[in-house]
């Protein structure tokens, strides 16, 4: 009788260790997603710091393009109002789209091509966009790893028991796959 009790106790201990280990692994992966999004946001902040300078440098040339500047302001406001990482991921695409449209519109203004300030800001913006792309890829990699982990048996039981949900990938806005050509 003692042997059966010890065996049952051993099985319970092993199961408890497995549950704790799995839970801790899921917590670590979930926190890694938030940490990687913070890296994306660092690059977004760099972009947000550049955008007002770019807008003010181009607004004088592009007075009739008022709607694009309003779109950019609206997208920045929506991003700033997003509370969760998943909400920010979704609203980030709106700013990307507005900024892409600004770059396309800028091609119609030859005077901008000779403006050194605008050219320098565009170079900085291009570098920032590259950094954002790298960080987004890393973010999507971490999200993918987490999502795969919570779908695998038997981890999916622990994930469901503790309320771990699938996380949202960063997806570009429709049409963003085609990069705007900017010639300054």
Regions found by a protein language model. Name each.
Residues 1-184:
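A helix-centric hydrophobic-segment signal that preferentially recognizes long
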